[in-house]
Amino acid sequence: MTFTRISHFSLFFSSFFFLSSTLSSHLYPASATTPEKDGKTRSLYSEILRDEAVARLNDLGKVSDADGYLERTFMSPASVRAGFLIREWMEDAGLRTWVDSMGNLHGRVEGMNASAQALLIGSHLDTVVDAGMFDGSLGIISAISALKVLKSIGKLGELKRPVEVIAFSDEEGVRFQSTFLGSAAVAGILPVTALKISDKSGVTVQDALKGNSIEITEDSLLGLKYDPASIWGYFELHIEQGPVLEWVGFPLAVVKGIAGQTRMKVTVRGSQGHAGTVPMSMRRDPMAAAAELIVLLESLCKHPRDFLSSGGNCNEQTLESLSTSLVCTVGEISTWPSASNVIPGQVTFTVDLRAIDDVGREAVVYELSNQMYKICDRRSVSCIIERKVGRFPKHFAKHFA
C-alpha cells in the first residue's frame, strides 16, 4: 500500500491497530486483560494510534537537510535532529533509551521477565534523496505509539518479555554507498573495514560518528552484535512502496521474504568527438550503446523466459519466480564530458536488480552481462561491468506469518 496522502486515515489506522493487537495477543500473560476489551483503550486508539502518530510522522517529515524535499543521510544534521525527536517520543512511551556506537537509537521496556527473549521492533531513520515521509518512519512511530497505548492503560509492565524499538541510523546507504550500516552492526555482519569507507567529501564512517560525539573502534563495533539466543523475533511495519496493495484494495499484507539484490556499475567507453563534424558512420558513441544496454535490461527483466532456458540452473520453478518477482532499474546515468555539443567519451550507469530466487537472480546477472558485452563488441566500444553490492534474499519466519 502506498500512502499518497496523510488523509488516508482508515488504511493508516489499520496498520497501527495491527501492531498494537500483535503486541497484545503475543506478549500479554494469559491471565492479563487484553487491551482490546478495555473501553479506555479503544478511545486511546484514535488519539494515540492515529491523531498523535500522524502528527509525529508529519513532524518527522519536516526534518530534512534539504529545502523543498526530504533528505536525511547517515549522521547528517537532520538525521541527528530526527534522532532527538524520536528519543523524546520513546521516553514519552516509557522506554529506556540509548544510542549505540553506530548511531542506532534504542528504546526498551523489560516487561515482567527481563531475562526472556526480546521482541525487536523498528525501522530506519535515514532516507533516500527526495524521500516519502513514511519510509522507515512508519515502522518506528507505529512501534512507539503501540507501546504508549500500553503505558497509558497501565499494561506496559505486564509484557511477558522485553520489547525493544530500534531506529537504525542507516539503511539506504546514500551517503557512503554501503547499505544497512545500522542493522548490519546489530546483526554482527558489518565488517570492521566499513568504518574506513569514505563519502564524496572524504569523510569516513568513523569520522562521521566522531563528529557527532560517538566514538567507535573495531572492538566496539564487534560488541554491537546481538546474541541470537536473546532475540524472540524482529517485526517491522513498513509501507509497500509500490502500487499493488492499493490497486487490489488491501490495507495490509504479511511479507514472506525480502528479495536478494545485485547492484552493478556499467562503464561504456567510446570515442569522444565534436557533435557537428563526426559523421554518424564513423562514430563509436557510448551513449547510444548505453541506451541499447538499458533497453536490453528492461526486456530481459520484463520477459526473463525469452532469455533464460529451463535447462541448467533455471528450472521451471525458478523461471516462474522470476516472472513474478524480478525487477530491474537504472537509477543513475552520467556522461563525460557532459556537453550538448560533444559526443561523450564515456557513459556510466547503475543497475539495481532484485529477485526473491537467488539462483534465478544470478542467472539473470550472468545472461545480462554476456549480452551487454556482445552489444558493446558489435558497437566497437569497451564495456566494464562491476558488481558493487550483493545481498542474499531473506525468507521470514513462518510463525510470524
Residue ranges of each PLM-predicted region?
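Short helix-loop-beta-strand segments that form the rim/entrance of peptidase-like active sites
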Residues: 151-174, 305-313, 321-328
